[in-house]
Regions:
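Substrate-binding/gating loop at the entrance of the active-site cleft, primarily
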Residues: 1-11, 18
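Helix C-cap/helix->beta junction micro-motif
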Residues: 7, 36, 68-69, 184, ...
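Conserved core segment of the aminotransferase class I/II
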Residues: 97-171, 175-181, 265-268, 282-283
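PLP-dependent enzyme catalytic core of the Aspartate aminotransferase-like
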Residues: 34, 210-211, 220-229, 235-293
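Active-site phosphate-binding strand-loop segment of PLP-dependent enzymes
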Residues: 16-86
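Conserved glycine-rich beta-strand-loop-beta hairpin in the small C-terminal domain of fold type I
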Residues: 168-178, 188-204, 240-242
Length: 293
C-alpha cells in the first residue's frame, strides 16, 4: 500500500470478517471489479494468511474472477510450506497466466529478518518481469553473503522431515491457544497454517475510558501481563474493533524439533515442557480476560 500511494495509485481493501473465516468473498471481489472496469488492477493474496492464520478455500472462484477481469495476482506464498495440511494450494493452479508467486526463506526456515526470496512469473508476464528486474537492480543489488550461503543449503537440500515437524508443532500449539482463548469467549478462528492467530476480545472486554481501541488493548496487555501482540488496526481493521494478532513462536525450536525426531505421539501434557513461555502467557491471558468480563 505505501508503494502504491507513492505512485498515486488507489488502494482498495476488500474487507473480510470472522464469519467467513477471514477469507476474501469472491462476490465482493467481483462487485468491486465490475464497478471499476476501466482501471488496471492488482490483487494481493496472502495464504496461509498473516494475520489470520487461515488458508483461502475458494481459490478456483477467485481465479475465475481474476480471469474475467484480467487481474494481475500477486500470490504471496511465504507461509506455504507451513500449511498444516501439508498440501500446496495456490491460485496459480487455476490462473497460471496472470499469477505471480512470491516466496522466500524467512518463514519456513525460521529465519525471521533473513530477507531472501523469489518471484515466479508466467511467460505471459515476461514484460512485467523485465521491468521489475530493472527496478530491482536499481534498488538493491544483492543480499548479504551469510544469507546467500544459508539459502544455498535451504534450496538445495530436502527438508521434508524438518517441515513436517515444523507444521506438526505449530499446529499443536495453535490448537492449544485456540481452545484456551475460546473457552473464555475470546473469538478466533483455528489457524490452518503459519504461526499467527487473530483474536476478537469484544465479548470479554467492556470498553472503558482506558480500552477503546485495539491499540489500547495491546498496551494494557503489555503493561499488565507482559504479553505482546499487535492491534488489528495495524492490519486494516477498524480502530475500535478489539481485535489483536498473536504470534506463537516464542519457544526453543531445537528442543521441539528433537522431540519430533521420533514418531512418538505428542501429548497435550507435554505443552508446558516444550512451549513454556507460550503456555504461561496464554494461561495468564485467560485469567486476565475472565477478570475483565
Amino acid at each position: 500500500a505505501p508503494q502504491a500511494k507513492f505512485l498515486s495509485k488507489r488502494v482498495e481493501w476488500i474487507m473480510c470478517n470472522m464469519k467467513n473465516n477471514w477469507h476474501i468473498d469472491p462476490e465482493e471481489l467481483a462487485k468491486f471489479c465490475s464497478e471499476n472496469k476501466s482501471e488496471p488492477k492488482i490483487l494481493i493474496l496472502n495464504s496461509p494468511n498473516n494475520p489470520t492464520g487461515t488458508t483461502h478455500n475458494r481459490l478456483e472462484d477467485l481465479a475465475s474472477i481474476a480471469k474475467d477481469y484480467n487481474l494481475i495476482v500477486i500470490s504471496d506464498e511465504i507461509y506455504a510450506e507451513l500449511d498444516f495440511s501439508g498440501t500446496y494450494k495456490s491460485l496459480s493452479h487455476y490462473y497460471p497466466q496472470g499469477t505471480i508467486i512470491s516466496g522466500g526463506i524467512s518463514k519456513w526456515c525460521g529465519a525471521g529478518g533473513w530477507r531472501l526470496g523469489t518471484m515466479v512469473f508466467p511467460e505471459e508476464l515476461n514484460d512485467l518481469r523485465t521491468a521489475i528486474r530493472s527496478v530491482s537492480s536499481e534498488t538493491f543489488t544483492s543480499v548479504s553473503a551469510p544469507i546467500q550461503y544459508a539459502a544455498i543449503n535451504a534450496y538445495n537440500t530436502s527438508h521434508d522431515r524438518y517441515l513436517w515437524a515444523s507444521r506438526e508443532s505449530l499446529a499443536i500449539i495453535s490448537e492449544f491457544i485456540f481452545e484456551e482463548l475460546s473457552s473464555v469467549g475470546i473469538e478466533c478462528i483455528k489457524p490452518e497454517g503459519g504461526f499467527y492467530i487473530l483474536c476478537d476480545f469484544s465479548k470479554v472486554i467492556n470498553k472503558s475510558s482506558s480500552i477503546r481501541t485495539s491499540k489500547d488493548l495491546c498496551k494494557k496487555m503489555l503493561a499488565e501481563l507482559n504479553f505482546a501482540n499487535l492491534p488489528g488496526s495495524d492490519f486494516g481493521l477498524p480502530d475500535d474493533d478489539l481485535i489483536t494478532r498473536m504470534a506463537f513462536v516464542d519457544f526453543d525450536g531445537s528442543a521441539v524439533l528433537k522431540r519430533f525426531s521420533n514418531d512418538k505421539k505428542f501429548e497435550k501434557e507435554e505443552i508446558p515442557m516444550f512451549f513454556p513461555k507460550i503456555y504461561e502467557g496464554i494461561k495468564k491471558l485467560v485469567k486476565w480476560a475472565k477478570e475483565q468480563s
